[in-house]
């Protein structure tokens, strides 16, 4: 497979931006202009190059708006939002860096300008009440409603009501990035979509200091409450056709949400089954087992990880980002937090239709360790109501979160969702 960078980490994150181009999240030429400016592993050069590209795209949007070209303006603003998001990504080893919040605020602001100019949908801002031990907060969300009419409906369904996808982010995504992964493909198919930023994600992490939590059903219960008590009363949403969708750690979160009886279908894309086991499998047995048995102290564990992180930028970023989103101070504490992120014993609560995907070529959540155990653990979902797909090759969905193959993923996902919701589309 062709690689833009020698390291898998920088290659994947560059491809993550570039692959959003068909959905409006990037322009190929703008991405290629960034490439020679960023040496492999150089987080500062990455930040500078993507920030400059974001500012340039935002400038193009301003110019288009002055001339009355709202289509060009919307596209430029949406690209700028994704570039601002990408710019700060590799700076997460220093959570106190003020550029993290500044870049995210720019990403959110310019994204709002972009989606408000779209003529394909109506975007409604949503606030989701959320409570945790440290106090109450409001999670930001966006409800996307297609303007071109509802999806074709099956027998017994009201034609003026829309099926709804609730899309959750994961470990390092943002609500704005989710637009390119979900709503951009769902809206033309007649689906309404609700995205939201949860604790430990996007602006909620950087501005509000909310931390990630393993019991994501606590979050999605609040989201579903808002859908049921507010959104379905004000907008044409069909409460009998609600699905949850997530990718990577978001796929794990989607599975947690799917235990709610108000959810009728779940799409879990390339999720983890046990996050600790995934991380454990990447460490020498003597080291991780020695720490688990307490023969090796936290101090020694932290010293070794920090020493190795000095040589490996990816390791430094993974533990740095983890400490930030979990709200802990050391690698050992990260490992303890990860032990809470597993689906073992939980998936028996899921009874709705479920589409489970895996990625054969990922270096994160491999199918053997994650996808297959998830599918097998869905014992209370009838076989005819669950489906398994393992993507292979970059063109066939073989990379994590189906990066580089969203069109293939969307085709399979929406055919399956249409079946679950009895949506009949005409043939040509």
From Swiss-Prot:
Gene ablation phenotype (knockout): Abolishes the production of acurin A.
Active site (UniProt): 248
Family annotation (SUPFAM superfamilies): alpha/beta-Hydrolases
Its EC number(s): 3.7.1.-
Keywords associated with the record: Hydrolase
A UniProt-annotated Pfam family: Abhydrolase_6
GO molecular function: hydrolase activity
Keyword Hydrolase: yes
Induction: Expression is positively regulated by the acurin A cluster-specific transcription regulator acrR.
Superkingdom of source: Eukaryota
Pathway linked to the protein: Secondary metabolite biosynthesis
Tagged with keyword Hydrolase: yes
InterPro entries for the chain: AB_hydrolase_1, AB_hydrolase_fold, FrsA_esterase
Family designation: Belongs to the AB hydrolase superfamily. FUS2 hydrolase family.
Function: Hydrolase; part of the cluster that mediates the biosynthesis of acurin A, a highly reduced polyketide coupled to a serine via a peptide bond. The activities of the highly reducing polyketide synthase acrA and the nonribosomal peptide synthetase acrB are collectively responsible for the synthesis of the acurin A core structure with a heptaketide backbone produced by acrA covalently fused to a L-serine by acrB. After the formation of the PK-NRP hybrid product, it is detached from acrB by reductive release to set up the formation of the lactam ring by aldol condensation.
Name listed for the protein in its UniProt record: Hydrolase acrC
């Amino acid at each position: 497979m062709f690689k833009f960078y020698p390291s898998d980490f920088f290659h994947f994150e560059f491809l993550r931006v570039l692959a959003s181009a068909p959905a409006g999240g990037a322009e190929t030429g703008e991405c290629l202009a960034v490439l020679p400016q960023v040496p492999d592993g150089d987080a500062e050069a990455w930040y500078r190059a993507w920030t400059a590209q974001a500012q340039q795209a935002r400038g193009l949007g301003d110019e288009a708006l002055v001339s009355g070209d709202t289509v060009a303006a919307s596209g430029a603003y949406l690209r700028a939002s994704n570039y601002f998001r990408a710019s700060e990504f590799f700076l997460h080893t220093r959570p106190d860096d003020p550029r993290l919040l500044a870049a995210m605020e720019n990403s959110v602001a310019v994204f709002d300008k972009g989606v408000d100019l779209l003529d394909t949908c109506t975007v409604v801002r949503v606030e989701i009440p959320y409570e945790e031990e440290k106090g109450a907060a409001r999670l930001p969300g966006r409800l996307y409603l297609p303007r071109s009419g509802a999806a074709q409906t099956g027998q017994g369904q009201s034609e003026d009501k829309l099926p709804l996808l609730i899309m959750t982010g994961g470990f390092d995504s943002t609500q704005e990035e989710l637009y390119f992964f979900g709503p951009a493909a769902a809206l033309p198919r007649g689906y309404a979509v609700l995205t939201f930023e949860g604790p430990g994600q996007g602006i909620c992490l950087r501005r509000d200091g909310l931390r990630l939590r393993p019991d994501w059903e606590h979050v999605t219960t609040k989201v579903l409450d808002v859908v049921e008590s507010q959104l379905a009363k004000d907008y044409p949403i069909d409460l009998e056709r609600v699905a949850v969708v997530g990718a990577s750690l978001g796929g794990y979160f989607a599975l947690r949400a799917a235990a709610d009886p108000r959810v009728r279908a779940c799409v879990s894309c390339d999720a983890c089954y046990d996050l600790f086991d995934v991380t454990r499998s990447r460490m020498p047995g003597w080291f991780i087992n020695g720490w688990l048995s307490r023969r090796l102290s936290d101090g020694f564990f932290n010293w070794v990880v920090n020493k190795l992180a000095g040589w490996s930028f990816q390791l430094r970023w993974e533990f740095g980002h983890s400490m930030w989103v979990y709200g802990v101070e050391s690698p050992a504490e990260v490992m303890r937090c990860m032990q809470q992120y597993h689906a073992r014993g939980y998936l028996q609560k899921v009874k709705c239709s479920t589409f489970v995907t895996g990625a054969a070529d990922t270096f994160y959540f491999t199918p053997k360790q994650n996808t297959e155990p998830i599918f097998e653990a869905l014992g209370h979902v009838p076989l005819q109501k669950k489906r398994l797909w393992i993507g292979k090759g970059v063109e066939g969905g073989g990379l994590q979160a189906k990066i580089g193959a969203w069109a293939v993923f969307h085709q399979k996902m929406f055919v399956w969702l249409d079946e679950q919701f009895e949506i009949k589309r005409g043939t040509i």
